[in-house]
Amino acid sequence: MTFDHPSNLPKIPLAGSCSGVYFLYNGDELVYIGQGWNCVLRVAEHTRKDSDKVFTHWSFFPVENESERKDLELQLRAQHKPKFNRV
């Protein structure tokens, strides 16, 4: 993998709102789907020492509306059945 400059990489804000549905991956495997009004803070919670979730990277899909976020999260969980999501 190569890149010409770090400024060309995707950016995720550390402050402010990045509401949406987020996806945790362990390598190529999708292991968890969640949602929140601030995905950065939610993903940070999954890095706690007592968390059983092991993941190598994450991504998110922006969704501002709370009910739309929750609906999309439920649909995606049912479709993909990530191993760390409870049924």
Locate the predicted segments by residue.
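Acidic, glycine-enriched active-site microenvironments
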Residues: W58
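Coupling/hinge elements of helicase-like and P-loop NTPase modules
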Residues: P82-V87
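Charge-biased low-complexity segments
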Residues: D52-F55
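GIY-YIG nuclease catalytic motif and its immediate N-terminal context
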Residues: M1-L41, E45, V63-R77
